[in-house]
């Protein structure tokens, strides 16, 4: 509806992806490379139809007391970043954290995982950076290299045989 009314040449899905990238950019600094990339790729300029559509979207969410998926992640991250007993207690409840399909997480989700696991004993991440398919939704396979930078003691176990499908597939 907003896309049509604002004469945007974007589908609702494309608009949602723009909104998601902008929210992440406002909240998170995922290394200088990510922030630079986010700034270079910004599509929001004050006064444009796109700016107006995003602003109306945010206003409607607020008016109706709603959260989109990014808002839920951002709110969870903000709660975990608080330096209080509640946040420490929550993070301490989990000694082991496993993240599957790690190649499909966003920088925001990466930061959430790190905060969630800050008192954990073990963090297991499973994925294949060569199979990242959700870049259009904000996932970034660079989270793998960031993980290895943040946890140089991590053991990497590579599987060299494809157990999912035969060679003909």
Where are these regions (language model features)?
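Short, conserved catalytic or adaptor-binding loops enriched in Gly and charged residues
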Residues: 146-152
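Short alpha-helix boundary/capping elements
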Residues: 23-27, 117
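Conserved helicase NTPase motor core
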Residues: 42-146, 158-165
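Short, charged amphipathic alpha-helical segments flanked by flexible coils
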Residues: 28-39
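Short, well-structured alpha-helical segments
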Residues: 9-24, 47, 51
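Short, small-residue-biased leader/transition segments that mark boundaries at the very start
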Residues: 1-4
């Amino acid at each position: 509806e907003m896309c049509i009314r604002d004469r945007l040449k974007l589908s609702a899905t494309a608009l949602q992806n723009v909104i998601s990238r902008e929210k992440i950019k406002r909240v998170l600094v995922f290394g200088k490379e990510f922030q630079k990339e986010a700034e270079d790729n910004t599509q929001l300029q004050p006064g444009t139809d796109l700016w107006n559509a995003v602003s109306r979207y945010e206003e409607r969410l607020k008016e109706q007391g709603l959260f989109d998926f990014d808002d839920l992640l951002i709110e969870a991250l903000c709660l975990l970043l608080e330096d209080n007993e509640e946040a420490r207690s929550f993070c301490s409840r989990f000694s082991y954290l496993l993240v599957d399909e790690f190649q499909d997480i966003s920088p925001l989700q990466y930061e959430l995982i790190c905060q969630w696991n800050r008192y954990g004993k073990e963090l297991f991440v499973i994925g294949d950076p060569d199979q990242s398919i959700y870049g259009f939704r904000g996932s970034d396979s660079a989270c793998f290299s960031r993980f290895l930078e943040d946890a140089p003691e991590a053991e990497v176990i590579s599987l060299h045989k494809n157990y999912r499908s035969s060679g003909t597939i």
